[in-house]
Each structure stands twice: as C-alpha cells, then as structure tokens.
Amino acid sequence: MLAGIDAAAAATPDEAGVRLFREKIQPVLEASCYECHSATATKIKGGLRLDSREASRHGGETGPAVVPGDPRKSLLIQAIRHEGDLQMPAKKPKLADAVIADFVKWVELGAPDPREGEPTPPPPYDFKKARQFWAFQPVKRLDPPTVKDRRWVKAPLDQFILAKLEAHGLRPAPPASKADLIRRVCFDLTGLPPSPEEIKAFTEDRSPKAYERLVDRLLASPHFGERAAQSWLDVVRYAETEGFEYDRHLPDAWRYRDYVINAFNQDKPFNQFLTEQIAGDEMAPDDPEKQSATVFHRLGPVRRNAGNPEIALSRNEILTERTDVIGAAFLGLTVGCARCHDHKFDPIPQKDYYRLQAYLAGTQEYDLLLISAGEKKVLDQQSLGINNELKRLRRAVEKAEGAEREKIEKQIEEQEARLPPGPATIPGIRNVAEQRTEMHVLKRGVWENKGEPVAPRPLSVLVNEALPELPADSPKPRTELARWLTESSQPLTPRVAVNRIWQQHFGLGLVKTPNDFGANGDRPSNPELLDWMASELVRNGWRLKPLHRMILLSNAYQQSSRSPMAAVAIKVDPENRWLWQFNRRRLSAEEIRDAMLAVSGRLNLKQGGRSVMVPVDKELVRQLYKPSQWEVSRDVAENDRRSIYMIAKRNLRVPFMEVFDAPALLTSCPARESSTHAPQALEMLNGKLSNELAGALARRLRQEAGQNSQRLVDRAFWLAVGRPPTREERNLSLDYLRGGLPKEFALSLFNLNAFLYVQ
C-alpha cells in the first residue's frame, strides 16, 4: 500500500523528534495501524508493515509512505487525512485533527524513528516473580502492633491506625459529639437521618453501652440492607434496561435488587453471596432465590441484533462484559485490559483472559417462570390475537412512509397497550451444552481472528502453574469458578471485599482504587490492617455484619471530623489516608432525596417489589421512550419510596440523581464521585422535587408547631440537621417567617451544609 521511509532521515534523529515519535506517533501506530500493518496482523494489507524502522523503510505496494521533511509528498499523511483513495485507518473514523498535526510535524522533523531490528515478542511471564507483588501475596494475619497510647484503643483495628499515626508524629482527633455520631452512623448504616426523638434519646443516655446498642439496632434494621445494597449495585452495574438505541427493559430485574437487600439484612456469608450470583442456577436450578442471584449476569448493557446483526459477535460482546465485571467486582483487577493483548501492567496473559471467560461459555439467558404451565397457557391464548395483529402491523410499518407510517406506529402502540401483563419471571441463566461457545484466544480481541482454543482455568498468577484447564464440557463450570474465588488461599477476594466495607464507612478505601488492586492501582495505606481484616472476615465465616460492627465500635470511626492539629497533619498526610480525623462527606444522591422525603414526612418505607417510575419532565421522556415505557404509578405514595426502589434505566437517569453523581450504570462503578457544581445548587433551590418537599415540610411544621414560630424553628432544625438552631440561625429564621415565607424557609434548610453533609 504505502512505502519507503528514508534511512538517512532516521539515522541521526534529534532528541525532540524522537520524543515526539515515542510520545505521540508510536502509540497511534500501535493502536490504529498494527492491526493491518504489523507482524502480528492476520493479513498484512498492502504489503506494508509499520511496526519497525526497517519494515517501514522497505515500504509496501504503492510507493513511499514518508518523504522526510515534506508532508505534502508523504503518502502516509495523505492516507490519514483521507485524501483521495488512501484512507487510514481503513473502515474506521478519521484520526483527530490534533493527531494528524503530530504526524505532519514528525515528518517535517525528518520522520525520526529510533526503533531498531525486528519487533520482539514480550517475554513469557515470570509468575514466580509476579507473585511477589503485594496483592498476589497470601493474606498475612499479623498481631496488632504495639502502640504508646493504649488508652485510645477500643478495637484491634485501632492499634493499626494509631501505630501508623504515631510513626508519623500524628495524633487522632478527639471523639465526635454524640449528635454528630448518631447522624453519621445512621446515614452510614441505613442511609436515613435519625429522628429528633432518636437523637435526644441517644444524647441523653449516659450508659457506656448506649452507642453499642445503637449500632446493634441499626445493623438489625431492615433499612441496613437497603443502604448496603446501593453500594453493591453500583459495583455490579445494576440497571433494569439494556441501554444502546432501544434500551430494552429487562422485566423483573428488580428481583436481583431485592435479593441483594435481603442477603445483606440476613448477613448471608459473602462467599455464599458470591457463589449464588456466579452459579446459583447450578446449585439449585428451580430455586427462585438462587435464580434471582444469577440476574447478576444479565445486568450489563447489551446491543441487540438490530444494532449488531452478527449474533456470534453480539454473544462475544456479552461474554466480554460479564468477564470484565467479574474481574472488577470480585478480584479487583482490570482483567478487561487483557482482552486484546497481554495486560500491559499486570501478570494477566491474554490466554488467561479467555480461560476466565471460558467458565461462562455455556451460559445462556433463561427466564424462570413463576407461574404454572396452565396459567401460562391461558396468558398465551389471551395474547395470541394481539400478537398476530402486531406482527402484521410491524411488517406494514417497514414499507410505510410519512403520515401512513405514523398512523401504523400509533396502531402498534395501541395494540401493545392491550397486551395482558406478562407472566412473573426471573431473568436468570442456565447452562446449555449444545449452545456452548467454542472459546479461543482472539487475536487483538477480534471475534473473527481466532487463535488457540482454551478451556476454563483461573488466572495463572493466583494458582499453581501445573494446574490443568477444566474440561470444556464440565457440567458446572461456574461453580468451579466460584469455588476458586472463595478458596481460603485466594488472596484477592477477601481483600477486595473488606476494602469496599472500609470505603463505605470512611469514604476512601485502604486501597483507594477498589476495582484495581494491580500495578496501576493504589497501594494500601495500611497493608497490615487490610490483611488483618481480610483474615478476620474469613475467620468469621465470611459474615459482613461483624466487620461493620467492629469498624463502627472503633475509636478510629468515632473520631471528630475536626482535628485540632489539622494544620500540621494535612502537610504530612494531605488525603487523610492514615485517619488523623474522620472524613466529612457529602450525602449521596439517594441519601439527599431520601432525607428530604423523611424530613418532610412524606417518605414511604414500603420495601421490595417492582421498581417505581417517578414523575420526570414529559418532554425529556418523549425524546427517549414511548409513553408506555415510562408509566408513572397512579398511587402517588409510590413516588415517595426510597431511591433504591426507583427504576434504573440506562438511557434516562432521573435528573436529580444524575446531578448529584449517581453513576451512569454502563460499567462497574467502584466509588461515587462527590462533585460540587452550579447545577446542584440550581436543583436544590429551583428543582421541582426540592420545592415540592419543602412545601410538605412547611405543612408538617405548621401541624406540629402550630403558630408558635419559636417552636417551629426549633422543630425544623431538629428535623433537618439533628440539633437546635444557633442564636444567629434562630433570629434569621424568625425574620424569614415574619415575611410569610414558610416554604422558602423549609427550602433553605435543605440547602444547609449541615443537611447535605455528614460530619
């Protein structure tokens, strides 16, 4: 295709040109050109290779690729500019203008290319050496370290925290006030604010066991599971629609959400929780609870055949997405980086990626009916005539145009509305041997470029290298995967699990990259503590509630968020990784909405069941869906349920939730952002939800306090921020009320930092 890079131009490359090549040119060649123009390409197109200096100089079939110093005569530049018939990369979007400018500059500098000789394949992994990396080492249970200030220690983990602080000349902050502490622990464990009565009872209780009793009560609350589940649903990219252009609804996906809530409330051991999600159908095919757990596999975005007509390719995309999320959620590894080539940073060969994917090769979607065969037959008969008419209309609409097309589309909507509700199902999975995907290493991740065949096997860095592959026709491959993930010798699963719990309570994990424990991820701020907690999790039968309890009863957790030595500590530890004070945090989107509902008296605490579609701007819905795809409940009380029960659609997120950093649900979300920007203030001051609930709060305050403005202000502050108003706050509030603005006063409370933040 293209040819010739002048040897003289690259013989003595200047430093700037070489730097430009290495930083700007070579990465683009590797990402955009090597697929067709390198030694590893399935077929070298145009006879041109660009993966070495010598190969580039030799050129291809159509002449010189580069004329050093003259971009106008360089065919490579013409090709990436898409001039004439030469277009590179072929059948892909044109390179960005800035990238093309880099190539032009490189040619003007004489096209310096420091590569010498033939490209050499990377050396095989030295797994023995790779296992020396901290994350792949066995979990070590060390005794808690000795500390100077023994009086500060309430729990063993305090010794690890205090030892780190003392080693750096720091001290922990004083204890938090009881008012701050109850608000903190209530939001952390239930996602809801404490009532004024609960706050007063706790602050007036002088018993040394008062806080312990509070923690135990909250851990036993059914709202504990709702709060804990939200964090997990982020990790597993929970949504009830498939995204892309159709955003197809996955009926009854909410059963997975309820399964997770119940699992956390029941304190289901984490190894069992993991196993049921990976292989619940293999454990008990007809058990609704186990099948609900396997909805985990169905939660990812899916491009259906209309957007991807090649069924085998679509299947590959689904398996890829599931493999990636298993690696992120349970192993804390970016295994997806080994899909197209060996992982650049972690000891994960491409072959290992497809071996991991092979555990899923026989997994097929399967909707478990929750009605009898007789009931199903009646439903089918009721739907038969409507479905036949729909088939006729859909054939007709393909040929129609203009007004006729609109008329038929309306008829389709009318017929769809007549369909009886579908049978209750669980959108789970099962193994189908005859539909098992033959697994191969895919060269560059391309479905058509199949390399050597592979069968299921764990990641090599985490097992004995002599371990053979599992037979491809193993009847329960995912059970074997779950068994490996939860083996006592497997170091990542317990570390990743306890790190997520730590993050829930302190805002930042001991490893602050919870989905990446690899070389590109963060190193643990307190590795001994991480391992001690991981071993404690396994010793306690993988139960999570004892871990929560231990953290919450520690002095590390009960610190104030205002350290008197902050000015010194922040210079030594600017991110507060060693916990010299508690990290103040903004409430999540769900917590803000639920808190406004609770304070206003509108919160509906109904648990479980179908997800709720809350009112959203009709114009916004109309742009994305048919009216039937966003049907607001006729029961207005349903709109006031907790945020975890709102439907999670990929193509339309509730604007209030989006502005406060609710995740996009396209991939695993290991940690929420906590941004601060103008649209948040606009939402809280001018948004329909905040104003509606401010009105409800104003009415509640009048009902509870009557016309006594002093009492009303006191009650308002106790409800909203869990304390009485300061003198200045009281005076300002009374002035506001004298102006006859009770709703605006209530709205101002929602906008206080004391409402939006936990100390």
Task: Annotate the PLM regions.
Residues 77-81, 156-165, 263-265, 273, ...:
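An acidic, gly/pro-interrupted, aromatic-rich
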Residues 168, 697, 731-735:
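Recognition helices and adjacent regulatory flanks at domain boundaries
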Residues 101, 182, 200, 212, ...:
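Generic structural signal for individual residues within well-ordered alpha-helical segments
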Residues 393, 397, 733-738:
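Alpha-helix C-terminal capping segments
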Residues 4-281, 343, 362-511, 519-555:
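Aromatic- and Gly/Pro-enriched helix-to-coil junctions and flexible linker segments
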Residues 170-175, 515-517, 721-725, 729-730:
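Short acidic, glycine/serine/threonine-rich helix-capping segments at coil-helix boundaries
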Residues 61-67, 666-672, 737:
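Conserved phosphate-binding loops in nucleotide/dinucleotide-binding enzymes
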Residues 461-464, 728-737:
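Helix-loop-helix junctions that connect adjacent transmembrane helices in secondary transporters/permeases
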